[in-house]
């Protein structure tokens, strides 16, 4: 049976967050026809979020070749989840892109898009080591004439207490040459140029799979590890240096190690995590 919703959740080095996600979301989605695919980049290269999400789509297309164009893809960060059923109406339709959590200048965080539409715009750019892929996705959707739906939307800088938030570090590798290239342009880089893709599928349950990606080649693979790639802090300001928990500024994220910091009102913690 073809699911109506397929969640594509990219991750690497996020085992605690993945554990929370796979415990919470089945309860949230128990009334839906859904599938969750964790797409795990398993090599030693910098994380390529755009390519990893594109590979999730490629797997969906291969698995459901006759029906994939009518599936709603939910591009979902592993660090954020709804608190309760029907908080987000994930299902969308052709030419409508739903944005539930994130920032309005991008299409990142939690986004629903028709799989046929995602293919039409060639998915995300395959950008190594930086998060610009969400900005480019927004531009591609605008050019295609898709309608953004933020009728239920929580802003990442203001409304983090309205969703389950699992904090992690903010350090990323940024390649300035690639940033300049993708600020300029086209739909050429995306799903269509990925090649030499190798992966295995781990079926964790009827509704949850892990796609372990061990290799893929993009148009920019030759730039990985180049000298102009520098370690920077993508949100360098006093709050994120000193630690900030949304209210009391008493969580130092640089000391949290691999464990996620959960920003959850106490009144909701017991009901959400009683099954963990």
List each language-model region with its residue ranges.
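Active-site beta-to-alpha loop of glycosyltransferases that engages the nucleotide-sugar donor
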Residues: 9-20, 42-44
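Loop/turn elements at helix/coil->beta-strand transitions in domains of secreted/extracellular proteins
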Residues: 32-35, 68-71
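Short, acidic, metal-binding catalytic loop of nucleotide-sugar glycosyltransferases
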Residues: 2, 14, 20-33
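Residue-level recognition of beta-strand->loop/alpha-helix junctions
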Residues: 38-40, 152
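C-terminal catalytic/acceptor-binding lobe
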Residues: 135-276
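Acidic ATP/Mg2+-coordinating residue in the GHKL
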Residues: 40-43, 78
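Conserved catalytic core of nucleotide-sugar-dependent glycosyltransferases
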Residues: 48-52, 57, 65-66, 72-200
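Hydrophobic targeting segments
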Residues: 3-9, 25, 35-38, 56
């Amino acid at each position: 049976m073809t699911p109506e919703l397929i969640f594509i959740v990219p991750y690497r080095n996020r085992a605690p967050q993945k554990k929370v996600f796979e415990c919470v979301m089945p309860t949230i989605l128990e009334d839906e026809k859904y599938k969750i695919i964790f797409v795990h980049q398993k090599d030693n290269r910098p994380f390529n979020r755009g390519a990893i999400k594109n590979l999730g789509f490629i797997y969906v297309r291969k698995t459901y070749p006759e029906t994939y164009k009518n599936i709603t893809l939910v591009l979902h960060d592993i660090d954020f989840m709804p608190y309760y059923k029907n908080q987000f109406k994930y299902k969308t339709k052709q030419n409508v892109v739903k944005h539930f959590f994130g920032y309005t200048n991008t299409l990142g965080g939690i986004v629903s898009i028709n799989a046929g539409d995602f293919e039409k715009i060639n998915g995300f750019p395959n950008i190594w080591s930086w998060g610009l892929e969400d900005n480019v996705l927004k531009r591609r959707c605008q050019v295609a004439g898709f309608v953004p739906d933020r009728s239920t939307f929580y802003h990442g800088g203001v409304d983090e207490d309205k969703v389950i938030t699992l904090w992690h570090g903010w350090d990323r590798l940024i390649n300035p040459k690639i940033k300049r290239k993708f600020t300029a342009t086209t739909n050429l880089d995306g799903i269509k140029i990925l090649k030499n893709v190798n992966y295995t599928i781990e079926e964790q349950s009827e509704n949850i799979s892990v796609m372990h990606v061990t290799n893929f080649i993009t148009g920019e693979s030759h730039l990985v590890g180049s000298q102009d790639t520098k370690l920077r802090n993508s949100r360098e300001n006093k709050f994120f240096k000193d630690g900030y928990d949304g209210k009391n500024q008493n969580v130092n994220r640089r000391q949290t190690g691999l464990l996620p910091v959960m920003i959850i009102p106490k009144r909701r913690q017991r009901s959400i995590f009683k099954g963990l």
